[in-house]
Amino acid sequence: MADLANLVEQLSSLTVLEAAELSKLLEEKWGVSAAAPVAVAAAAPAGGGAAAAPVEEKTEFNVILKSSGDKKINVIKEIRTITGLGLKEAKDLVEGAPKTVKEGVNKDEAEKIKKVLEEQGASVGIE
């Protein structure tokens, strides 16, 4: 056990250059690469992402107002209708674009909201 403690002390006292050289020597001696664990770790999320691909079908969407366009007053009116906000709150939302208009809505509702706002000249995105 004292040998291990001594080894830890010696390794702790190495400079960065000495530690890099030690790493190279150990790679050669043991026939391994220090980069291998990184490659394995990078592959794990990719595999997890592939497994999650079927679940990728979103059921809830956020409607984002990117800009109000030329007909800001009409967009404010539609925002009030869609969200139930008061005049000041709807105006602040429109003037503060990009802002989320509605969160967690289904795809059909998100598309309807987008269509209504775009008819008024707004630029809208769905996430």
Curated annotation (Swiss-Prot):
A single Gene Ontology CC term: cytosolic large ribosomal subunit
Record-level Gene Ontology MF annotations: mRNA binding; structural constituent of ribosome
InterPro entries registered for this protein in UniProt: Ribosomal_bL12, Ribosomal_bL12_C, Ribosomal_bL12_C/ClpS-like, Ribosomal_bL12_oligo, Ribosomal_bL12_oligo_N_sf
Superkingdom classification of source: Bacteria
CDD domains tied to this protein: Ribosomal_L7_L12 (cd00387)
Keyword terms, alphabetized: Ribonucleoprotein, Ribosomal protein
Any one GO BP annotation for this protein: translation
Matches recorded under SUPFAM superfamilies: ClpS-like (SSF54736), Ribosomal protein L7/12, oligomerisation (N-terminal) domain (SSF48300)
Disulfide pairings: none
A Pfam family it matches: Ribosomal_L12_N
Family: Belongs to the bacterial ribosomal protein bL12 family.
Subunit structure: Homodimer. Part of the ribosomal stalk of the 50S ribosomal subunit. Forms a multimeric L10(L12)X complex, where L10 forms an elongated spine to which 2 to 4 L12 dimers bind in a sequential fashion. Binds GTP-bound translation factors.
Function: Forms part of the ribosomal stalk which helps the ribosome interact with GTP-bound translation factors. Is thus essential for accurate translation.
Name this protein carries in UniProt: Large ribosomal subunit protein bL12
